[in-house]
Design a protein with these regions (language model features):
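Short, solvent-exposed loop/turn segments at secondary-structure junctions
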Residues: 28-29, 67-71
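Short, well-ordered beta-strand micro-motif
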Residues: 11, 82-86, 104-107
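Nudix hydrolase/Nudix homology domain
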Residues: 27-29, 98-139
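A generic structural micro-feature
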Residues: 1-3, 73-79, 95-100
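Active-site-adjacent beta-strand/loop module that shapes the phosphate/pyrophosphate-binding cleft
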Residues: 69-92, 119, 125-126
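A short coil-to-beta-strand element that immediately follows conserved catalytic motifs
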Residues: 57-65
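Conserved Nudix-box catalytic region and its N-terminal flanking loop in Nudix hydrolases
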Residues: 13-52
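Conserved N-terminal beta-strand and adjoining loop/helix that marks the start
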Residues: 1-18
Length: 139
């Protein structure tokens, strides 16, 4: 079974709204993020994905959720890691128009309705905290 890591950004604006992206491949909504590429750290991948999908420069903070799932059909074991992310500016721009159809700032309640794969409210994730530390290369 192949291992896959996927990172997501929980970004909240000054009004308390969270940013969601509407994906073209499955016609669904998600937090900005995506697959960690070979050689990337989790933070590098998330910074890249947020820029590609939203045009925002991400300041990656603490981990707020780790989920996992297995797919026998795809023969993959996936770790989904959600980070709290801050940005200096809230003006968004889709750079990956073939992957992202729309960006939308929504209230937490509205976002919860669109994010059907989470069993908890984003409110819960906004208050979670687990420190992330990259230990770099160890010989």
């Amino acid at each position: 079974m192949k291992d896959l890591k996927v990172v997501y950004a929980l970004i909240q604006n000054e009004n308390g709204e969270v940013l969601l992206v509407h994906n073209t491949d499955d016609d669904g909504w998600s937090l900005p993020g995506g697959k960690v590429e070979y050689g990337e750290t989790l933070v590098e991948a998330l910074e890249r994905e947020v820029m590609e999908e939203t045009g925002l420069t991400a300041k990656v903070g603490d981990i707020v959720s780790i989920n996992e799932g297995k797919s026998t059909r795809m023969n993959v074991h996936t770790l989904f890691i959600m980070f709290k992310v801050t940005v200096d500016e809230y003006k968004t721009e889709i750079h990956m128009k073939d992957e992202i159809a729309e960006l939308r700032w929504l209230t937490v309640e509205e976002a919860d309705e669109k994010l059907v794969y989470y069993h908890h409210s984003l409110k819960e994730f906004l208050s979670n905290k687990a420190t992330y530390y990259n230990e770099g290369y160890v010989d």
